[in-house]
């Protein structure tokens, strides 16, 4: 076994379903899967399949999603082995995927739970307050975003009373919030976010690009591999004749900002339009662009497919898409196929739906493919592709 994980050995936690596979075998199996899915689009003497980007095999995650069970005096942070049994809590504070700094953080959180009287939510009795603790770390400055998911605001005064003591033990520039999730259901978070700190974002930095992480927003879980993913996209397009481009499903702007920075070093008039449904992600992307002092950048909170289908301005020279697992979908794929932009970058966490989208992109040839092992010890992976319009 690659990692010594007693939880896997005892079959208490099987999230890392490939833990018994040697790492080289994991990568080979992922490459075989990817090539099988995209084989209809691989062109001899044209499509370049680059070697996979490897991950660290431990301590690569920047976040933890901990179910809280046990008692207020002795909370258990980890998972429920049986979702319907509150007594089935498994403590995962020693999970080898977490950064080393989390080791010191978990005892601080357990102490805080007791001091603030945050009784763990009991799913069978429908009683208690604290459901989850969600933690994200910045690799850049080690600051922490700490979110307590509660059933109600009832314990807020006690939390605020104990907060100064907690903040004194957290890294500088950390963010603490309460997320209110009143439903009796296995839903990770609710809509209401109450910030207990002045700061509402933690700053990450990939390749000298500041990126701001907010609650309820998507951010890659493997920062070392993610930074290489963005740098690769930047490298692929930096010498192309691009005057304007779109970044669809842009999140906090990782792809668009990397590409805009490289392109504007040669031509400051290059224009970027970034589109993302999440308003908080767009606020983060806008903040990054301002900090980088980039010009001609527009980020807007819209549905990516609706934006593209209704946009009447000039055809962009490049479109970047980084959709969720479901892919970009047939209507958007067919639209992009007719739009005729010279270059497409498609980044995907689900090669199966990406391959389905490629079927509709019949006017394009697949020029480059690279696998990024964002999720070691599982069957999942990220893939970056570069497509060019057929002449």
Swiss-Prot record:
Q: Which Gene3D superfamilies match?
A: 2.40.50.1070, Vaccinia Virus protein VP39
Per the record, the domain of life is Bacteria
Which PROSITE patterns does the record cross-reference, listed alphabetically?
SAM_MT_RNA_M5U, TRMA_1, TRMA_2
Q: Which UniProt keywords apply?
A: 4Fe-4S, Iron, Iron-sulfur, Metal-binding, Methyltransferase, rRNA processing, S-adenosyl-L-methionine, Transferase
Question: What are the catalytic residues?
Answer: 349
* Enzyme Commission code(s) on record: 2.1.1.189
Q: Where does [4Fe-4S] cluster bind?
A: 5, 13, 16, 95
Q: Does the keyword Iron apply?
A: yes
Catalytic reaction(s) noted: uridine(747) in 23S rRNA + S-adenosyl-L-methionine = 5-methyluridine(747) in 23S rRNA + S-adenosyl-L-homocysteine + H(+)
Query: Which Cys-Cys disulphide bridges does the record give?
Result: none
Q: Which Pfam families match?
A: tRNA_U5-meth_tr
For S-adenosyl-L-methionine, which residues are the binding ones? 220, 249, 276, 322
Q: Which GO terms describe its molecular function?
A: 4 iron, 4 sulfur cluster binding; iron ion binding; rRNA (uridine-C5-)-methyltransferase activity
For the biological process aspect of GO, one term held by this record is: rRNA base methylation
Looking up InterPro entries in the UniProt record yields: 23SrRNA_MeTrfase_RlmC, MeTrfase_TrmA_AS, MeTrfase_TrmA_CS, SAM-dependent_MTases_sf, U5_MeTrfase_fam
List, alphabetically, the NCBIfam families matched. Answer: meth_trns_rumB
The entry's family comment says: Belongs to the class I-like SAM-binding methyltransferase superfamily. RNA M5U methyltransferase family. RlmC subfamily.
Function, please? Catalyzes the formation of 5-methyl-uridine at position 747 (m5U747) in 23S rRNA.
* Protein's name in the database: 23S rRNA (uracil(747)-C(5))-methyltransferase RlmC
The gene coding this protein: rlmC
